[in-house]
Amino acid sequence: MKIQVSRNGICGTDLHEYYDGPIFIPADGPHPITGRQKPLVMGHEFSGTVVEAGPGVTEVQVGDRVAVEPIYRCGKCRPCVSGNYNLCRDIGFHGLMADGAMAEYTVVPQSQVHRLPDSVPLEMGALVEPMSVAYHAAKLSGISDQRTALIYGAGPIGIGIWFALRGMGVTEIAVVEPSAGRRASIEALGAETLDPGAVDVPEVIAERTSGLGADAAFDAAGVAPEQLYRWCTPARPENCVPDCGE
């Protein structure tokens, strides 16, 4: 179906592709599902309005406001048939293996489209994809209410994880962020922050938890593996959830 793009976010992956790519964009041959290769239009965090629908489209109709799940899957491999299409052996991504939403219009399969409720504006619809990443990370941690969590990075994914944990009932959340501007933004939402340039984060968390460590830690900053190891030291090792975003 053809979608008129309303809003499209710029993901960290887009920046890496632009400055250092091709990384995920097929360079040596067409993608096995989409048949596309470079050059491609990027953009996968978006919302829009359906303006054309093919004859086999039944779930949405022209005029519907939608958010798009950007995953292409074959539907035939073992992960796909078992319901784990995010592990498809030929997985593709809209805006990386097919022309994306940094354009006025883009075309996607029906299986990737989700109708927005009337209460959700298109501006918020563009946040569905990145916020689903944040929510998934929060759920993967297994953390429950009345627990302690650390989030490294107060960018969009870090903020999303903070919201998700709050919604799950987690009461003690510290956000580690070196940027004063980003600290101010998430503090305005009610978050507690730690400046790693001013305090020793593992030491602070150890003091707060009687040496036990946080119940979960999330990397929403995108850093080197050796730094991840250090960041996980203030968390209980079984509940460190690294590499959630950038």
Description of each model-found segment:
Residues V120-V199, E203:
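Mid-domain Rossmann-like dinucleotide-binding core that forms the NAD(H)/NADP(H) cofactor-binding site
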Residues V66, A149, G213-A217:
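Receiver (REC) domain switch-region micro-motif
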Residues S141, A184, L189-E246:
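Glycine-rich cofactor phosphate-binding loops and adjacent beta1-alpha1 units
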Residues E59-V62, D145, R236-P237:
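Short, flexible surface segments
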Residues G21, P178-S179, E246:
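Residues in the short beta-alpha loop(s) of Rossmann-like NAD(P)-binding domains
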Residues P30-H44, Y72-Y152, R183:
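NAD(P)H dinucleotide-binding glycine-rich loop of Rossmann-like/cofactor-binding domains
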Residues K2-N8, I23-R78, P117-S119:
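Glycine-rich beta-strand-centered segment in the early N-terminal region that forms part
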Residues H16-I23:
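Short Gly/aromatic-enriched secondary-structure transition segments
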